[in-house]
């Protein structure tokens, strides 16, 4: 059995971002955790999917959320 695709997604928000962003993130299939953070990024989501296509699909859903400005995907290597 192949390993799951795992990634940390760092998210930059627009000022007009949704107040329930974390709840919207956690509702997306494949997202294991999400939270607002301080620093150069505004939020993060940890993602686990069966394959790269699932990871891409999850990332597309994150980017479609109102107020998401940009994302940075950090794939795990081990």
Regions found by a protein language model. Give the residues of each.
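A compositional/biophysical signature of low hydrophobicity enriched in polar/charged and small residues
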Residues: 1-78
